[in-house]
Amino acid sequence: MLLAENRAPFGSIYVSEKDFENSDSQAWFIATQIRYYLARITTAPFEVKANDDGNGIYISFDKDYADDEFSINTENGSLYITGGKRGVIYGGYELLEIIGCRFFTPDCEKIPTITKLEIDDINKREKPIFEFRDTDYGSVTHYLKFATQCRVNGRWNDVPEMLGGSIRYALGAHSFAWLVPHHEYRDTHPEYFSFYNGRRQNVENDHWQLCLTNPDLVDIVVKNAREILKANPDKKILSISQNDNPYNCQCENCLKSDAEEGSPVGTLIKFVNHVAEILEPEFPDVMFDILAYHYTRPASRKTQTRHNVCVRLCASSTCFAHPYDKCDDRSRAVKHPNGKTTVFIDDLIEWSKVCNRLYVWDYTSNFPLYPMPFANWRVLQPNLQTMAKHNVKGVFEEANCAANGGVDFNELRTYLLCKLMWNPDCDIDAYRKEFMEYYYGEAAPHLDKYLNMLCDFVEKGNYHLYIQDIKRPDYLSEELLITYNDLFDKAEKAVAGDGIRLSRVQKARLSIRFVDIFWNEILSGNYNAQKINQFFTDLRAHNISRLDEWSNIERTYRAWMEGKERGVYLSTPWRYDRESIL
């Protein structure tokens, strides 16, 4: 099918009369996007018009499609893109990718130049494997159009309906503090809080949970959840989940319930089921979410979730050097009340048998040491395939959430994860090759060799990789750093005449420089102020704002200069670094 030739379009881009008059509609948005990119590709002046009977590209929303579903069809000399409210947008970007466009990062797109643009006949209909797909890499959280191009549909930030909106949580996680405010009840009702270490944890600290067998708490949580949902009618998931600590209630009633259920999660499920049942008539479209996290990770053997309760299974205490189903390390297995232990794959399999709405909270970075090379490249696809195999419905890939990203090839990891969340069986090697060759140019072979060396060493040595480790891993030894630096020397030389790609290589090299400075300078006490100052100067030049999850780089810089290894030791509560950018 001919779309354009010699700067002349073969037809127009058509939307319905309703969408033509509404510049905030999804169909109008993607129609103008297609017009923009086709003009860049062909220099042909395509027009967006209201439907008529001429040949062209027809774009339409269809309520019978799932929100993220789309179809593309060529028929009788025209091309038809149809989809749900996000699907119609995804379908438009899919057409552009078929033509040869690639959306690698918010500021790196590959747009071909074609004088005679023809496409083969298309007859495809797609919807994602996972209904919920999210990551908190900065390029996705702060550039909403790019997130849409990546087909991410779960957002921390507001996404305008023009971009299809998003699936949002009213409370995202660790929500006990909002549902039963500690400061409000700690003095008058200490019995509401967890019994641990011989006392109720109603003191001002970070060690409290709720006593979920206390009958008074259901009414309090229902009241506060109702207020939150009424104030946020667009948010369709509310998390009722424990705080981020392992100090669950050890009172007699809670321990008895935990033992009967085979896991503390059973006690949590009974509580949340009760809340969800009460609120369902008023909020029939809302899903109530729990975290299967740390002590609640093992599945319950007795009480199961209601139809309007979702489980988010967290892959914490999990090795990310090997696929979930291939790792032999049980050193960080979770202990059950009866003394039995399970690793993540055990829990995933059990949850998949008893829960019909299972999400996974996955991890992709070393959170205390964001810049450290994280050799998880070869587990990204098999882990998502394992999730799909076990009927997981949604995935959140927690990452380096700094607004401007990080230095450990975060751009590549974001791109690959988004492709895999849409289709875990995609040709990930082809996507990686395309990205590396375009984003890094002639430096790509050297950088690809570096990434493969990291993974080769981890696999051959059966090394285990965790998200909170601060110890220096064997694959970052002094001897190997020499080899890695040699590869980066070659990479820089290969793009010495290409300022943009040279800058990207130098940014990636900051990861190796961090390893050298952190272990050879900071932890050893052998401070080289000039070396440290230059490192932070280069971090700022690349707009890097965080070296760990909890502190910005200025606080980390001060900590290092004061002989402290991490900025968290000077910490004040962290926040996102800037507002979202469309």
Briefly describe each language-model feature range:
Residues 46-68, 74, 80:
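Short, well-ordered secondary-structure micro-motifs within conserved domains or adaptor modules
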Residues 6-12, 18-21, 25-33, 37-41, ...:
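Feature activates predominantly on carbohydrate-active enzymes
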Residues 288-320, 371-379, 404-414:
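Substrate-binding cleft/loops of secretory-pathway carbohydrate-active enzymes
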Residues 207, 245-247, 314-333, 365-367:
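Conserved radical SAM core fold
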Residues 54, 233-236, 283-288, 307-309, ...:
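Loop/turn elements at helix/coil->beta-strand transitions in domains of secreted/extracellular proteins
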Residues 417-582:
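Catalytic domains of carbohydrate-active enzymes that cleave complex glycans
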Residues 213-219, 227, 332-443, 449:
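Structured mid-domain segments that build the active-site/substrate or prosthetic-cofactor binding neighborhood
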Residues 258-275, 305-325, 387, 416-426:
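Acidic, His- and aromatic-enriched active-site or binding-groove loops in soluble protein domains
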